[in-house]
Amino acid sequence: MSDSEVEYDIAGSLNPGVDSEDDYSSGSESDSEIPDIIEDSEDETGPQQGEPGTMTFPNLELSDDDDDDDDDDEGRKKKKKKTDDSVESYFGAPQTGKKSSGSFAGLGLSQLVLKNIARKGFKQPTPIQRKTIPLVLEGKDVVGMARTGSGKTAAFVLPMLEKLKVHSAKVGARAVILSPSRELALQTLKVVKDFSAGTDLRLAMLVGGDSLEEQFKMMMSNPDIIIATPGRFLHLKVEMELSLASVEYICFDEADRLFELGFGEQMNELLASLPSNRQTLLFSATLPKTLVEFAKAGLHDPILVRLDAETKLPEHLEMTFFAVKENQRDACLAFILKEVIQMPFATPEQLKELERLDERAIDDGERDEDRKQKRPKFKKERLPPAHQLPSEKSTIVFCPTKHHVEYVIVLLQTLGYAVSYIYGTLDQHARKNQLYRFRTGKTSILVVTDVAARGIDVPVLANVINYSLPPSPKVFIHRVGRTARAGNRGWAYSIIKDNDIPYLLDLEVFLGRKLLTPRLFKQQNPDPSAEPDYVNTLTIGAPPRQALEIHGEELAQMVKDSYELQQLSEVAVKGERMYNKTKGSASQESAKRSKQIMALGWDDHHLMFGEDGESAKDALLARLGQKRIRETVFEFRKSKTTSGAEMMATRRAQLAPIQRRAAEKRAIQEKERLAGLVHSQDAEIARSTEEDMATEADLTGFTTEEDLRAAKKAQKSKKRSFRDSENFMSHYAPTNDDKGYAVGNFAGAASNATFDLINDGSEMQQKQGMKWDKKKGKFINAGSEGGKKFIRGEGGQRIAASFRSGRFDKWKAAHKVGNLKVGALEESGPATKRVLSAREFKHNKNEAPKRADKYRDDFHKQKTKVAAAKEDGRIQKPQPKSELKSTADVRKSRILAEKRKQKNARPSRGGRGGGRGGRGGGRGGR
């Protein structure tokens, strides 16, 4: 068995006394379709085994007592009854001796779902799955909060399949899963297909960029589950006049992104159309601590399942920060890749393979333009398993804007690395190709933006590099949370400048981890052999100065020699200028503390690189500089009696006591801080780790797991709090952790969103401010259009929410079908069967291209196509005309000759002169 195939004996786990090797053997069917990572939790015990005598799984066998007593009539009746109810029991939960949340069988899932889980090779549920699946099966509205890669997708897909079971003959979708991006929707579709194998459930994926006619056909096939992006789903809802009254189960995947800028209008339209008795789930890697504003989503008595407060970052993640100057960031990136990570350069074989893939991508693009050409099939390489690294040094580089992405990829390719890239406005086909190269190990570096990285399926990584520090702590967690998964170790390197220090201090407070400079570490640990803790502290320092200078000179020469790099560098600088204007500001307290951190040697030699050889030289220069008395320009080479010298002496006499008192105050504050006698920011950091979980006042309107468990045991009503949920104002300020998770109303989400990923370009930026309305004669909000409801289509354009183009009406008339009647039974007439079974006509003819016209713009391109067609034999050289006549040609020529004879033998009408007519009858007629 290969490493990519995992075998798990569920029958043996449920009943250790029965050998289940004959039942089935689970293995990974396709490693190319990897769902959202379902990690094995290391801190959980294995699945608890059932008591002897329980039935095996998945074959419905009798217990040991029934098998031994074959003559017992009662046993035969039981066996007959079980045989009759085999279908129902197969879709029901297995009868285990004791329910255990340590295994999927103990969560109440049916045997068919368990079989599909085992076939994919998953053994134990993750914490988010253990806590949410039983609640969802009970019909509760759940808000799930867990970091990226914790198995959130399976947490809502498995109970959905358990509830739907089989296809419904009634018209109307019963489950809807909304995703913020096409990539995430495709990933969710793969998971649903894997776990629904063996059922007759119908799926439909509705995303932008696909054919509307094909999606009309999908919706007319009465799907049970719809996986869609909000833009296209609302487009089809308006165009087809869909009714969502049949929806029983709706899930908002990556809910914080769905309810932010891009999909706010679409979500409000969709939520108003959903029935009130639906079950609503919200899942995301980052959700706010207070979820009162999400009441607009229609949650009824929701239960909050939050795991990120327990471990905000992966357990084995090591982090460090490199302090650089303004013009040293590129040199630091090259230094990290070459010296720290030791990234190998691209081999000649890799470069040839990448060139071949580029040529194939160009050919595919030309075939898309010329749809008559048939696309050749290439054998795709299988993706590695979820627990295996794409390559040994696989690294993601996060950039702030797409302009930085374009600059960095050219820079790294010039250095000799194999690089892939993805940003928000990249074409969907190009995204797939770039991600496929990175997943298969053909490239070792993936350069992305935050907007593009959300929803990208990269299970395991070795390193993460932040080209610039993100302004939000949660964006930082989302970035670095992609490494050190599934018990693996990983590194996160961040490049920061002096203006990033306030954001770094906000991150320090949010994570509850102490910022450690080289100077502070040496004061706390006099032992020179001591190593810093990169897991529990935020270690900062500067890379070796000499190495940075070498890489900086090399890159400067590269940029000087390349016109493309010069242009991209200028565009990236302008893009960063706009990015800094739009990103949020750090807290005032962090801005004040940043000066203290800079005074503590934040840019000293980094502890990772051992002793600093430059420090001794700097100390010597400092001592030499102190040998002479420092003089100002007013005193240099002037006598003491001049006015300037007297003024400086008076000023020094006045400032000396003030400077002395300030130095004494700083020394006292430092002693108090070390003694723990003051409530400083450090005390807030220490206290924030104890206040991660939400209090009762913070989670007003939400039920926690502990409350639900206590209510089931005691069967008593919970004592009502004296605090009014609407008017109560707390007497203490929220902690920094609360501020990080806080969210305002949706009207102000553009500026106060808790996890607002700044767009990597200006294409999706909304207008801000006021503009003059000529008709109204006053200023109005630039983002409003007179109160009309608009939606943003998949192309980015704003259209009216009630707009119908009539394409569905034309499609219905062409296929002779009617509207969907939600709630009615499916039609099985000939018209419906014809529509569902009809195949889309595709041009398969490989005709010769037209002759190239030198006056057209595509002359050279068409000339190349004609030359290729001649080589393929589609265009043949003209042959000489045959002189042999066929029987039909001979007969035709004889008939024509006979007609000429008859015409020439007619008598003339004229007189003399041969019938030339007129007077005289010819030449001599006079």
From Swiss-Prot:
Biased composition (Acidic residues): 19-45, 62-73
Recorded GO CC terms: nucleolus; preribosome, large subunit precursor
Organism phylogeny: Eukaryota, Fungi, Dikarya, Ascomycota, Saccharomycotina
PROSITE patterns: HELICASE_ATP_BIND_1 (PS51192), HELICASE_CTER (PS51194), Q_MOTIF (PS51195)
Compartments in which it is found: Nucleus, Nucleolus
InterPro entries: DBP10_C (IPR012541), DDX54/DBP10_DEAD-box_helicase (IPR033517), DEAD/DEAH_box_helicase_dom (IPR011545), DEAD_box_RNA_helicase (IPR050079), Helicase_ATP-bd (IPR014001), Helicase_C-like (IPR001650), P-loop_NTPase (IPR027417), RNA_helicase_DEAD_Q_motif (IPR014014)
One biological process term in Gene Ontology: rRNA processing
Top-level EC class as recorded in UniProt: hydrolase
Protein name, UniProt field: ATP-dependent RNA helicase DBP10
Catalytic reaction list: ATP + H2O = ADP + phosphate + H(+)
Regions of compositional bias (Basic residues) in chain numbering: 711-721
Keywords: ATP-binding, Helicase, Hydrolase, Nucleotide-binding, Nucleus, Ribosome biogenesis, RNA-binding, rRNA processing
Gly residues bias spans: 910-926
Every Helicase ATP-binding domain range: 133-305
Region (Disordered): 1-102, 362-387, 709-731, 835-926
Source organism per UniProt: Yarrowia lipolytica (strain CLIB 122 / E 150)
Signal peptide (UniProt feature, chain positions): none
